[in-house]
């Protein structure tokens, strides 16, 4: 009887280990699938955005600064708004700051390694100063560790003004550069919209799938919840920006690659913190002036 029990116990243990290993394997498989989804989502978004820009007669840089950057910032928006609604102010602001640090320090760096990025004059004269200005504005308004509803409204109004200026900016006749000349139009403008919409959906779903499975793998490896949050979740919400900018660089679309990063950093502060602050005034001592100074410096 004892032998039968030991055999049964051994059988159960063996199958438990087998199932555990299968579970690990499935998480790795889903992680790889999420990367594939991110790649093709970015491919569709960049293709649709570039074609739409050429069809509308506007610079792909403007598309990168608006449609692409706003779309790829959706994960940060969802996380920060949920955090604000739950009274988790530190998470709401930390998510935005962490994403902005990641965008410039990692995404722009990797994109430049993939393909040397050409910086347009508009970026240096308008968009980069706006990005630095929004970082400085956040630093000043957050010196008291609070973002009131009035201050949040100021963020949103500044963003609206910036977007309106971008879209109604005089379309000066210019020499078409090599990058824009190589852009291929899709068969119809509706396909551009479809590519952009499906690309954004794939990016949001792919980044969520990546975070979930990467977190499970990290837990099995013994990583703490705090460490997972500071690394995997923070990087995970920036996966759409990373995938889009890297694919844009591979396709030699410097304007979209850079515009996506600069636009996302502007959008993260002005819109995400603006909306989160309107829903629930933000107050936390966990984010200090050094974080704000670092944001200005890296911008």
Outline where the language-model segments fall.
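Hydrophobic alpha-helical segments, chiefly the membrane-spanning helices
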Residues: 7-8, 13-299
């Amino acid at each position: 009887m004892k032998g039968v029990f030991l055999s049964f116990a051994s059988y159960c243990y063996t199958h438990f280990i087998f199932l555990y290993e299968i579970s690990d394997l499935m998480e790795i498989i889903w992680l790889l699938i999420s990367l594939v989804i991110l790649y093709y989502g970015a491919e569709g978004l960049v293709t649709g955005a570039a074609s739409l820009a050429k069809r509308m007669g506007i610079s792909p840089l403007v598309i990168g600064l608006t449609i692409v950057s706003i779309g790829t910032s959706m994960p940060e928006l969802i996380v920060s708004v949920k955090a604000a609604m739950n009274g988790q102010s530190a998470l709401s602001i930390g998510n935005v700051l962490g994403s902005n640090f990641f965008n410039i320090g990692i995404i722009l760096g990797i994109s430049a390694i993939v393909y040397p990025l050409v910086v347009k004059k508009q970026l240096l004269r308008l968009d980069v100063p706006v990005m630095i200005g929004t970082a400085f504005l956040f630093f000043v308004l957050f010196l008291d560790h609070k973002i009131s509803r009035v201050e949040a409204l100021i963020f949103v109004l500044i963003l609206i003004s910036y977007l309106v200026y971008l879209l109604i900016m005089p379309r000066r006749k210019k020499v078409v550069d090599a990058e824009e000349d190589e852009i291929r139009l899709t068969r119809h403008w509706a396909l551009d919209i479809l590519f952009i919409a499906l690309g954004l959906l794939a990016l949001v779903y792919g980044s969520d799938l990546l975070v979930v499975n990467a977190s499970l793998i990290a837990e099995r490896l013994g990583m703490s919840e705090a460490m997972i949050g500071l690394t995997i979740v923070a990087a995970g919400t920036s996966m759409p920006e990373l995938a889009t900018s890297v694919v844009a660089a591979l396709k030699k679309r410097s304007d979209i690659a850079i515009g996506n990063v600069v636009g996302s950093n502007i959008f993260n502060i002005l819109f995400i913190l603006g909306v989160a602050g309107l829903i629930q005034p933000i107050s936390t001592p966990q984010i200090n002036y050094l974080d704000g100074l670092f944001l200005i410096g890296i911008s």
